[in-house]
């Protein structure tokens, strides 16, 4: 299988997201290839696909400081990017999705590179890379028709004061971890490589992957760049994508499940039937969850109806990661089994 590598020519989040999507869905379409993609976003908040932007982000501070904000197309939680942060994507044929420990296997060479330069990095938990118990990288996954994408951040020299300033960390997550602040849960790789600048570190990382994977560098032509820029402006930079429709709901509930993440449900009910329903959270979905919520709209708002629908979803794990239908029902109905 041939491997390709690319470092984005821009640090604009909307462009970089559109370029990532293009690599996933259009580049060498129909061919079984591996793509390694590096990019950096300047001064940017990134929320997960299934998160509520208004709840996750301190919007007053974001607007005051003119911080970029966009929603990625994968699940997981919100993060802050600056030029001390390096993002990476690894794209593989969809068949590779079936391997066990997909996150760990896919990012094995990231850990190998860091170990080779003296950083004691390791994979931990459901989707994190850590150094001595502190997180420096969070991973998320997404499936296209033919390919699987695993991508993540790598905190090299990020300003953690901004990380805490712009993100509203969920209290249930903080309580479960027994830690007081965002800063105490994360670490910069630069603490272990004090003599390296971010550009030099990225250069070494790209060189390592190019040599280890025998990767061919991708050279973007003008038509591809224009296509990516058009997609960035029309989709990833749009209000509809980044904020979406909001509404008043009859019922809202949220809970964190160990090993699965936060699940929040907002339901609007009229005359006993679901008019609208939204699921939010940092659960690790790899495909769009809209088909699930569409099945629930118009149904009776009762436990047995929802249990039957959720229980009959064959690819449930692709929609909700390690969340179970029972856990979702617990949140949706607050432990009340309506008859």
UniProtKB/Swiss-Prot annotation:
Subcellular location, record wording: Cytoplasm
**Residues involved in (R)-lipoate binding:** 135
- Additional information: In the transfer reaction, the free carboxyl group of lipoic acid is attached via an amide linkage to the epsilon-amino group of a specific lysine residue of lipoyl domains of lipoate-dependent enzymes.
Q: GO cellular-component terms in the record?
A: cytoplasm
Q: Which organism is it from?
A: Mycoplasma pneumoniae (strain ATCC 29342 / M129 / Subtype 1)
Which reactions does this protein catalyse? Answer: L-lysyl-[lipoyl-carrier protein] + (R)-lipoate + ATP = N(6)-[(R)-lipoyl]-L-lysyl-[lipoyl-carrier protein] + AMP + diphosphate + H(+)
Q: Which Pfam families match?
A: Lip_prot_lig_C, LplA-B_cat
E.C. number: 6.3.1.20
According to UniProt, the name of this protein is: Probable lipoate-protein ligase A
Q: Cite the annotated pathway.
A: Protein modification; protein lipoylation via exogenous pathway; protein N(6)-(lipoyl)lysine from lipoate: step 1/2; Protein modification; protein lipoylation via exogenous pathway; protein N(6)-(lipoyl)lysine from lipoate: step 2/2
The family note in this entry says: Belongs to the LplA family.
- Function description: Catalyzes both the ATP-dependent activation of exogenously supplied lipoate to lipoyl-AMP and the transfer of the activated lipoyl onto the lipoyl domains of lipoate-dependent enzymes.
| PROSITE patterns per the UniProt record, alphabetical | BPL_LPL_CATALYTIC
* Signal peptide span: none
Q: Which SUPFAM superfamilies match?
A: Class II aaRS and biotin synthetases, SufE/NifU
Q: Which UniProt keywords apply?
A: ATP-binding, Cytoplasm, Ligase, Nucleotide-binding
Q: Which GO terms describe its biological process?
A: protein modification process
